Regions:
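Class I S-adenosyl-L-methionine
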Residues: 190-240
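Class I S-adenosyl-L-methionine-dependent methyltransferase module
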Residues: 58, 62-130
Length: 240
């Protein structure tokens, strides 16, 4: 399928945006995942270097990841991911007062999680490349209703300085085309600044698209300011 990302989102493909490596345990905390969620069809968008897909599939589940960076060649992508792990670790250590390090086993534990997640994702990519699809919001190369849940980590709201209200709404509407439920985390920007006006405006616009939204608490977040996630569902969606 031809990927047709909107030009606005091409700005998010540059080197300023981290290709982040996170584990399934971190996703479980951020998105409040439970056993029923993990039995469904999951899309991680953008997947980055997260090992969630690899771990879900290794346990017998069904998950895929979508990210514009997957269009890179294998060695180019590996280099970008490993460089961004170094950059992410350095950034967080430089702002260590903004994080609850005990949640990730201290500075050393946090770095180990990042490197392990990246290694696991890259190993899975080599073994099962069909799980990692090159694509970008707001035009994903996936069929409507091809998943039960879309997870969106550290893109929307995180880069609010580069994405406006319409960008956020268009992205969420597209993810809601793929699955009846979308979970987005965090609701602060990359510096931890709250975005109440943007969040309210997004929710209001989504309602006009017949998408219901609610804000849920996140238990023991690693980033201290990132205490909530946004859950978006089609208004006709019946939760199990």
């Amino acid at each position: 399928v031809t990927v047709r990302p909107d030009p606005t989102f091409h700005a998010l493909e540059d080197t300023d945006v981290l290709v982040s490596a996170r584990s399934l345990a971190e996703y479980t905390d951020m998105f409040g995942l439970n056993g029923a969620d993990l039995e469904g069809r999951i899309v991680d968008c953008p997947g980055g270097a997260a090992s969630a897909v690899a771990e879900i599939c290794a346990a017998g589940g069904h998950a895929i990841a979508v990210d514009p960076q997957y269009a890179r060649g294998a060695e180019d992508l590996r280099g970008r991911i490993l460089a961004d792990v170094d950059r992410s670790v350095a950034q967080k250590q430089a702002r260590e007062v903004d994080f609850d390090w005990d949640v990730r086993g201290g500075v050393v534990g946090h770095e180990a999680i990042r490197r392990t997640a990246a290694d696991r994702m890259l190993t899975d990519l080599a073994a099962s490349p069909e799980r990692y699809i090159a694509g970008a919001l707001p035009s994903l190369p996936l069929a409507s209703d091809s998943a039960d849940l879309v997870l969106c980590s550290h893109l929307l709201f995180t880069y609010a300085d580069r994405m406006d209200l319409s960008d956020h709404v268009d992205a969420i509407v597209e993810m809601a085309r793929i699955a009846p439920e979308v979970r987005i985390y965090p609701l602060v920007d990359h510096l931890g600044n709250p975005l109440p006006e943007l969040v309210r405006s997004v929710i209001a616009r989504l309602k006009k698209e017949r998408l219901a939204s609610r804000i849920e608490p996140v238990i023991r977040p690693f980033q201290l300011a990132a205490t909530t996630r946004l859950v978006v569902e089609r208004m006709n969606h019946q939760r199990p």
